[in-house]
């Protein structure tokens, strides 16, 4: 049976109205924390910036493309923080045991603390991020949370509910959008809420995208409530990773949650945000494009089309930057 992602604007608005009060809380670090910009001389070398740029281009290509639509003076900050995220992801994926991963996360916590001193840890990434902190007043909260949430996810192993994944996305993945907003000089409640919702969609995409690899390793990142709801037989999938009708239903359900958030951002938060926030919020475009490819693959995460880079992302980023939104009339039916 062919399925379509939910694009009904009334359903999107209903979800947003229902959760608006929670999203507009006063506990936003961006609203509460204001860093004073330092006049310290930059410590990063041109080779440090190039190292970060190449690391992001190789390991996070879609978001590298997003960075190219940001004002030139902000790109180094974006590359530095994205490069830091690449290393944090590697810390969880490449270490052979949890203790080794904890040691690497401890190193990154110390590194983050050093970024707010005059003597940052001397690595290319830390020097570039240090300069971003000093130049743009990047909140310490986002960088600390980036480290802590990656470690928490490693130790938690699985998520009990879809709501847990959404909360994780708001905390972990949105921490990559918030600093970009700060580098753009945007301190705005609506833009912050947009970043949270984009973070949810990013987490949904990442969890679905990793399914083929994780199932082959005897793991599954789908929240347990969806697995139970759709009666997914994980033991069978661990032995023979493949698409089953039950897995397809669960993936469809999960993907729709992420896609609804993106439509909600474009419909509600983006029009209320400063126009200067758009370069950071364009992080939604690659996620939307991937989820729509998943839809064309009939929600089969094993489809090879999902593992390849899409040439459409660059064009859609350009179009969204020109129109001021990533929604098209065809997004609703």
Task: Please place each PLM-identified region on the residue numbering.
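A contiguous catalytic/ligand-binding core that recognizes phosphate-bearing ligands
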Residues: 183-193
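Catalytic cores of Mg2+-dependent Asp-rich isoprenoid enzymes
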Residues: 2-15, 23, 29-132, 139-150, ...
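Internal, conserved structured core segments that host functional sites
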Residues: 151-183
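Conserved phosphate/anionic-ligand binding catalytic regions in large, soluble enzymes, centered on
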Residues: 206-207
């Amino acid at each position: 049976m062919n399925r379509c992602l939910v694009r009904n604007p009334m359903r999107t608005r209903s979800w947003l109205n229902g959760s608006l009060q929670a999203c507009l809380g006063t506990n936003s670090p961006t609203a509460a924390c204001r860093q004073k910009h330092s006049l310290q001389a930059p410590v990063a070398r041109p080779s440090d910036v190039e190292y970060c740029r190449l690391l992001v281009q190789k390991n996070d290509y879609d978001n590298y493309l997003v960075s190219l639509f940001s004002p030139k003076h902000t790109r180094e900050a974006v590359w530095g923080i994205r490069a830091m995220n690449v290393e944090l992801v590697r810390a969880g994926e490449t270490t052979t045991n949890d203790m080794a991963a904890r040691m690497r996360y401890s190193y990154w916590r110390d590194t983050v603390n050093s970024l707010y001193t005059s003597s940052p840890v001397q690595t290319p990434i830390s020097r570039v991020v240090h300069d971003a902190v000093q130049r743009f007043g990047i909140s310490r909260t986002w960088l600390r949370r980036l480290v802590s949430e990656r470690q928490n996810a490693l130790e938690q192993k699985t998520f009990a509910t879809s709501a847990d994944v959404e909360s994780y996305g708001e905390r972990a993945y949105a921490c990559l959008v918030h600093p970009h907003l700060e580098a753009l000089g945007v301190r705005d409640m609506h833009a912050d809420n947009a970043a949270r919702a984009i973070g949810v969609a990013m987490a949904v995409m990442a969890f679905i995208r990793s399914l083929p690899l994780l199932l082959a390793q005897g793991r599954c990142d789908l929240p347990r409530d969806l697995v139970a709801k759709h009666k997914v037989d994980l033991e069978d999938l661990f032995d023979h990773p493949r698409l089953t009708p039950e897995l397809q239903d669960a993936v469809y359900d999960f993907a729709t949650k992420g896609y609804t958030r993106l439509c909600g951002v474009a419909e509600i938060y983006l029009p209320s945000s400063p126009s200067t926030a758009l370069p950071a919020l364009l992080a939604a475009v690659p996620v939307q494009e991937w989820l729509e490819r998943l839809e064309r693959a009939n929600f089969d995460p094993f489809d090879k089309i999902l593992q390849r880079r899409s040439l459409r992302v660059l064009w859609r980023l350009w179009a969204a930057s020109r129109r001021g939104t990533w929604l098209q009339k065809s997004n609703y039916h």
